[in-house]
Amino acid sequence: MNIKDCYNFEDFRKLAKKKLPSPIFHYIDGGADDEVTLNRNTNAFNDCDLVPNILASVGEPDLSTTVFGRKIDMPLFLSPTAMQSLYTPEGDKASARAAEKFGTMYSMSTMASFSIEEIANISSGPKLFQLYVHKDQSITDDLIDRCRRANFDGLCLTVDTLVAGNRERDHRTGFTTPPKLTLESLLSFAMRPEWVFKYLTNKKFELANIKHKTDKGTNIAKSVIDYINEQYDPKMNWKDAEYCIKRWNGPFALKGVMSVEDAKRAIDIGCTAIMISNHGGRQLDGSRSPFDQVKAISDAVGDKLEIILDGGIRRGSHVLKALAAGATACSFGKAFLFSLGAGGQKGVERLLDNMQKEIRRNMILMGCKKIEDLDASKIIYRN
């Protein structure tokens, strides 16, 4: 099986599982606690049906939309995800180049494997930076200022990771950053010699954006949970978010909004967008899925800011359902990380090509000429 044989999410997942050591595969694949929310994120789309209109003379549909002040060629972009060099040596560079090739947005994590400046130098495409509020205020300020100098288009502040979720798979596999060989993980790494060779012969693992501020999580092997609990500020509040918005002074989203009340308050403090997200089911297990919440939030604030649905996207039809329910665009992480692990930049390009074709095909079948044609009349909920 190779990249050319990958036609859907499960194909990329299977190929990534064959190529990645078990701790790294399960870091992508897993969620919090019993993984109820992880599974619900995708299953929620099954409770909604698309309603097509026939004989609409669609021709070639326009898939473009605008987010964070930039036009993107399809209403789907890459979510910010950490430590991408664990999946392929090129890491974020591969993702950014693939996103630019398909005219969509690349999103960078604070915990990226390459720096803000390195990505700005290799990509002129739309770029979003994901910010965390650190206990050390100078780290937060430095990240915001560097993004401005590097001409990133927008910032999103992640607000659902005050403490790390209970990711039991990581406990069982002994996942650390950088990877550390233990009795539990030794066999899984030994079974992936190609990955081990690439890891040992390429750029040393580091959290490139913050390496000059702290060595925690860079040259010291520790769990992601430990890093989050040590570095991120669990006392973050609305004033902290407003401070970041004012310091950035540009397109800004809160990532992790799940209630109408919080969406309204995001407007009050100056957000231009929100990302409806539960961190891919990796934080609070038992919480609602983004798709379950998007209609209520859109009905309340959809005319005042951009709404990004983040989580559970596996198919082009999921994107159409989210847009019809009121989202401006969607983002996905797990799917593209599997494609990155399965085939590097070419893997991500294959995934984006698949998704673009699915969205286009389904737009034609729905009788929709442009994204704005996808409204509440195009879906019916089963319950």
What do the predicted segments below correspond to?
Residues 1-69, 178-236, 372-374, 380:
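An N-cap/entry alpha-helix motif that binds or orients negatively charged groups
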Residues 1-46, 289-309, 313-383:
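Alpha/beta catalytic cores of nucleotide-metabolism and tRNA/nucleoside-modifying enzymes
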Residues 32-33, 110-114, 135, 258, ...:
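Short beta->alpha linker loops
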Residues 49, 64-66, 75-79, 105-109, ...:
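Short, conserved beta-strand segments within well-ordered enzyme catalytic domains
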Residues 72-111:
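Glycine-rich active-site/cofactor-binding loop and its immediate structural neighborhood
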Residues 77-83, 126-132, 225-227:
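Short, basic, glycine/proline-bearing loop/turn elements
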Residues 83, 97, 122, 138-309, ...:
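Alpha/beta enzyme core
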Residues 100-122, 126-140:
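A gly/proline- and charged-residue-enriched helix-loop-helix capping module
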